[in-house]
């Protein structure tokens, strides 16, 4: 998995994408099989790259910093290392970055205190619509603002220990708590704007560590954010994590889908 890690080199590789950065969900638990039917696995040239969210039969919402020159999409997956009869493979016919996302950030070796990493969103159009099944479903866009203190969770595939490069294979879940952006602002020198959400571990329940970029943040049962960035220290249960807030971007999401479907 990839994650926009603020203390690592963010220079572009030859493909025009961020270099692959391994990620972990530490101290969480294995999600119940197919309990997150909107969960998408975004691949680049046959390798797992990012998470994503199925928001329309033919559209996936993910993080802009997951940009690459080639995408493949898997839906209906739980264990990425096994063949599953619920799985659906899709090619991507086009990609659309949020026009407000600052692409120059991806060319920087280091991020600076004045950098604004808001609007970290990208829509991927599938070449063919997904088949909606028990294991593949759309996640509704939010209709209400999230509340501070909400119980949230996110999910993703990746490493589950700070001491190994072995992936979990199975989809992992972790519980978080939504907190004020001011708390993240004290932890991070980069700009915390009204376009992002800040969450931290709930009762030391686990860590997304380097995270699962592009995955959904679900708060009190409502889709509210897309996993975006944080620092790289793993299993630090004092860490705060930043998610792109979906509500302010609804107009762009809906218009992009309508105009390009």
From Swiss-Prot:
UniProt-listed Gene3D superfamilies: Trypsin-like serine proteases
Cysteine disulfide partners in this protein: 31-173, 50-66, 152-219, 184-198, 209-234
Domain Peptidase S1: 25-258
GO molecular-function terms, A-Z: serine-type endopeptidase activity
UniProt key word Protease: yes
Catalytic activity: Preferential cleavage of Arg-|-Xaa bonds in small molecule substrates. Highly selective action to release kallidin (lysyl-bradykinin) from kininogen involves hydrolysis of Met-|-Xaa or Leu-|-Xaa
Gene Ontology cellular-component annotations: extracellular space; secretory granule
Signal peptide: 1-17
Key words of the record: Disulfide bond, Glycoprotein, Hydrolase, Protease, Secreted, Serine protease, Signal, Zymogen
Annotated EC: 3.4.21.35
Propeptide: 18-24
Main location: secreted
Keyword Signal: yes
GO biological process per UniProt: regulation of systemic arterial blood pressure; zymogen activation
Domain of life: Eukaryota
Active site: 65, 120, 213
Compartments where located: Secreted
UniProt tissue specificity: Detected in prostate and semen.
Glycosylation sites: 79
Family in the record: Belongs to the peptidase S1 family. Kallikrein subfamily.
Function as written in the Swiss-Prot or TrEMBL entry: Glandular kallikreins cleave Met-Lys and Arg-Ser bonds in kininogen to release Lys-bradykinin.
Protein known as: Kallikrein-1E2
Source organism per UniProt: Equus caballus (Horse)
């Amino acid at each position: 998995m990839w994650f926009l890690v603020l203390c690592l080199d963010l220079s572009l590789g030859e493909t025009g994408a961020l270099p692959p950065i391994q990620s972990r969900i530490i101290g969480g638990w294995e999600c119940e099989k197919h309990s997150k039917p909107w969960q998408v696995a975004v691949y680049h040239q046959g390798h797992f790259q990012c998470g994503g969210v199925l928001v329309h039969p033919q559209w996936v919402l993910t993080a802009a910093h997951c940009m690459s020159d080639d995408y493949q999409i898997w839906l209906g997956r739980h264990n990425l290392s096994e063949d599953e009869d619920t799985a659906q493979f899709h090619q991507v016919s086009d990609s659309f970055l949020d026009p407000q996302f600052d692409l120059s950030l991806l060319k920087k070796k280091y991020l600076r205190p004045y950098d604004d990493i808001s609007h970290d969103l990208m829509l991927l159009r599938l070449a063919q619509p997904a088949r909606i099944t028990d294991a593949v479903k759309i996640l509704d866009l939010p209709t209400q603002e999230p509340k501070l203190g909400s119980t949230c969770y996110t999910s993703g595939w990746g490493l589950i220990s700070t001491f190994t490069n072995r992936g979990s294979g199975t989809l992992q879940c972790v519980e978080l708590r939504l907190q004020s952006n001011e708390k993240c602002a004290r932890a991070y020198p980069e700009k915390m704007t009204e376009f992002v959400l800040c969450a931290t571990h709930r009762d030391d329940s686990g860590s997304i560590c380097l995270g699962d970029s592009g995955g959904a943040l679900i708060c009190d049962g409502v889709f509210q954010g897309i996993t975006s960035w944080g620092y790289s220290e793993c299993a630090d249960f004092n860490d705060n994590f930043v998610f792109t807030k979906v509500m302010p971007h609804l107009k762009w999401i809906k218009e992009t889908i309508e105009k390009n479907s």
